[in-house]
């Protein structure tokens, strides 16, 4: 079952209440402890039918949207009509939960380019062709977990230096092309380890959601999101060291979660 970005954030309550009211009544989501036994026994089942709720909500919104905006349905194909209505239902603002800033939404590529606190991560991302294509694609639904510049600077090795050990390759006189390819592979691995496109397989444990990054090959997932005391945290599944999400920015084709840590280290 696909858990899309909207369902993930609604389940965690990570979208600001103002936005949440425009999408779904969060009070209708029951993630109580009473479901924990069932979750352990059937880890790939949600305790409620998220997709059913969203489908019913979409149907109601479709009717209201047609009356309110006067769509020229005769001039649009079915796929174009769905995209138009979906865009209208999506959150229309970028939210900074720490400072309360509200800006008109843009695609991830444009938004990431102007967030100075994560400019290093953005630069690495722009070196990966397929990642740039995702950030520019308005049809995508991505979760980008972006380390701050300070977090990247504190790593013992630069993102392009691991997991392939570039220093060791240079000392062993590896061919220049081998080194260049290894550097590109390292950068792609670092960036993709911080991006979730969607999760076909996931486990829900209390208020924690397990997700697969684009670099993940495990069965369970390599990233964990959770809510605690009305704040949001993210961790690598390898160490479960949860870090506070400083800022949640909602873009047109995904969200950016900013943390003072890297999900992978040398």
Curated annotation (Swiss-Prot):
Pfam families: Fasciclin. SUPFAM superfamilies: FAS1 domain. Disulfide bonds: none annotated. Its main location: other. Residues 105-263 form the FAS1 domain. One of its GO terms (cellular component) is vacuole. Residues 1-20 form the signal peptide. PROSITE patterns: FAS1 (PS50213). It is found in: Vacuole. It comes from the Eukaryota. Keywords: Signal, Vacuole. The keyword Signal applies. PANTHER family: FAS1 DOMAIN-CONTAINING PROTEIN YDR262W. This is FAS1 domain-containing protein KLLA0E16841g. It comes from Kluyveromyces lactis (strain ATCC 8585 / CBS 2359 / DSM 70799 / NBRC 1267 / NRRL Y-1140 / WM37) (Yeast).
């Amino acid at each position: 079952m696909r858990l899309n970005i909207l369902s993930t954030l609604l389940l965690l309550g990570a979208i600001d209440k103002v936005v949440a009211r425009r999408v779904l009544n969060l009070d209708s989501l029951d993630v109580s402890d009473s479901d924990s036994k069932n979750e352990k026994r059937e880890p790939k089942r949600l305790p409620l039918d998220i997709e059913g709720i969203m489908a019913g909500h979409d149907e109601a919104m479709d009717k209201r949207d047609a009356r309110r905006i006067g769509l020229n349905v005769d001039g649009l194909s079915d796929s174009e009509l769905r995209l138009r209505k979906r865009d209208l239902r999506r959150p229309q603002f970028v939210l900074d939960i720490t400072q309360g800033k509200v800006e008109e939404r843009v695609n991830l590529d444009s938004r990431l380019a102007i967030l100075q606190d994560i400019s290093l991560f953005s630069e690495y991302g722009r070196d990966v062709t397929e990642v740039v294509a995702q950030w520019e694609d308005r049809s995508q639904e991505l979760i980008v977990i972006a380390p701050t510049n300070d977090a990247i600077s504190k790593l013992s090795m630069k993102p392009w230096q691991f997991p392939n050990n570039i220093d060791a390759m240079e000392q062993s006189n590896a061919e220049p092309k081998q080194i260049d390819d290894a550097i590109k592979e390292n950068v792609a691995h670092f960036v993709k380890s911080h991006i979730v496109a969607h999760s076909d397989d996931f486990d829900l444990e209390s208020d924690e959601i397990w997700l697969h990054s684009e670099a993940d090959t495990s069965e369970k997932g390599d990233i964990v999101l959770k809510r605690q005391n009305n704040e949001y945290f993210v961790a690598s599944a390898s160490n479960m060291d949860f870090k506070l999400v400083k800022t949640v920015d909602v873009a047109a084709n995904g969200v950016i979660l900013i943390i003072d840590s890297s999900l992978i280290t040398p």
